[in-house]
Each structure stands twice: as C-alpha cells, then as structure tokens.
C-alpha cells in the first residue's frame, strides 16, 4: 500500500525547535512511505517540516532534528490518519486480553484466556478482563411465568394512597390538630403531612419509623395499606 495520500499539512514551523545532530540518518518521508517502515524517529527529521533544509543540503547540511515532544505529537496524528484506512484499523495497537468461558458436552466449564485485536467484535459469552470496575448492577423486571406481561406498578414502591390520606386527615381533625401540629409531633415538616393526605406523593412502609410515629400520634395501633 502506498502512502502518497497522506499529505503533510497543518505544520506550524514556529512550534519547532531544530537542532543539529552529528550523525544524520537517511531521509524518510513518512507521508510517502510504507507505514510499517515508519517509526517515531522518522518524525524527528527537520527536513519534513522545513523545505529549505531539504532542498539545500549543501547550504544547511544534514542531521537537523526537532524536539521529541513535537515529533511524538506529529507521530500520533499520522497514526490516527493511517488507522482510518481499511485494513489498518488495528495498526500498531496492543491486543486486548479477554476471558472466554467454554462448556463441553459433559457440562465442564473452562475459562480460556486469549488476546484479540482492538475494536474486534466480542462474542456474547466473552467479557473483557477489566470490565465491571464500576460495580454497576442493572435490574430488569421479568415475570416468573413465561408469556405474562409485567406491570410496572408491581415494581414501584408503595405510596400513601388518597384513601389513606383521607382517613389520616379525618383522624387529625378528630384530634383537633393542624398539619403543622401533627408534623411537630412526628418531627417532620407540615408539607410532608400535606403530601401524605394528598396521596401518591410519599412512600409508605409499615416498618418506617416515621409511619410508626404517625400512627402513634393519631392514636391508632398501625396504619394499614389500602
């Protein structure tokens, strides 16, 4: 494959610091060479960036190089350009180590460690070795019986229903308490009492200390979900 299409563009000569070396190397233009023959040292040659040094070797001599940091930046940009070409997607990429589980006909499970190319499509039973670092667990609602649609309501937390709110409001008025007074007794804000009496706004759990305190303040044994 010829690399004549890789044009050396976007070079700012002001960013380059050119130094003279005693042992010059053979000039290799990385943008017109086989990518397998190009190395990081190829981008240190100042003749790539300054046409005067390349066209007038009798005047400027040879062995001029740029600083290594600039050559590394240009090498990385060239590498990304090469990898955009078909067949060079994994050019000079380190393979990824993965673990694959295999089960034989006797039910024995084996774990095989292998290396694959970067961005290769992983099989369904293959997991990257470094995967799962975030310890994230995703739960999906599924029915125990096959063919039955799952209702999202079954997986939502229980809330104080409007019917429960009306009964709590009636008990509060029977005791002659306002929403603020009842909230002070159970150490909550009056807005919480208002949301409980409205319904479908506050989570209900019979083991919640707030729910137990509310039942005690209203003079009942427990609050039943209905």
Swiss-Prot record:
InterPro entries associated with the record: Cro/C1-type_HTH (IPR001387), Lambda_DNA-bd_dom_sf (IPR010982)
Organism: Acanthamoeba polyphaga mimivirus (APMV)
Protein name as catalogued: Uncharacterized HTH-type transcriptional regulator R559
Family annotation (SMART domains): HTH_XRE (SM00530)
Pfam name, any one: HTH_3
Keywords per UniProt: DNA-binding, Transcription, Transcription regulation
Domain of life: Viruses
DNA-binding region boundaries: 179-198
CDD domains membership: HTH_XRE
A Gene Ontology molecular function term of the record: DNA binding
Residue intervals of the HTH cro/C1-type domain: 168-226
